[in-house]
A protein has these predicted regions:
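Rossmann-fold NAD(P)-binding glycine/threonine-rich loop
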Residues: 10-14, 18-70, 88
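Active-site-lining helix/loop region of Rossmann-like oxidoreductase modules
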Residues: 74-137
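Short amphipathic alpha-helices and their capping/turn segments at secondary-structure boundaries
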Residues: 1-11
């Protein structure tokens, strides 16, 4: 799926995976169509040693532009993140906070990535952080 992505120089680096799998756009991949693995797990396999964090895939670019620092019911809009490296997730969560949103930890890549991919209640919903947290729990 990510045939053009090179692992050169990415070992030990944090890679933010913003991608979503759309078979009609990306072509069909049996392991993704069967939901055996997430696209983030496939990316992590293709970038051994990279510290993959899935983030920014469930928010539209217009929300990133227009809703920076916006509060809904007294809370910032949540952006779900998933990953297997707690320290990498903390770094990405810090970045999300710096740009005016609140990171919501959805768990590891395998489990969490499924919670904020296309077709879920969290995908492009622009929910307050606590509401998003309840949906990914």
């Amino acid at each position: 799926m990510f045939a053009d992505v090179s692992a050169d120089g990415l070992a030990g680096k944090i890679v933010i995976d913003t991608a979503n799998y759309y078979p009609e756009r990306d072509g069909h991949f049996t392991e993704l169509d069967s939901d055996d693995r997430t696209s983030s797990e496939v990316l992590a396999e293709q970038l051994p040693g990279a510290r993959i964090v899935k983030a920014f895939n469930a928010i539209q670019w217009t929300s990133l532009r227009d809703k920076v620092g916006e509060y809904v019911g007294g809370q910032r809009i949540g952006i779900p993140i998933s990953g297997d490296d707690p320290q990498a997730k903390r770094v990405v969560a810090g970045l999300i906070g710096q740009i005016g949103f609140e990171a919501v930890d959805a768990g590891p890549l395998a489990e969490g990535g499924r919670k904020h991919q296309p077709g879920t209640d969290c995908y492009t919903a622009d929910l307050p952080a606590d509401e998003l947290r309840a949906k990914v729990a």
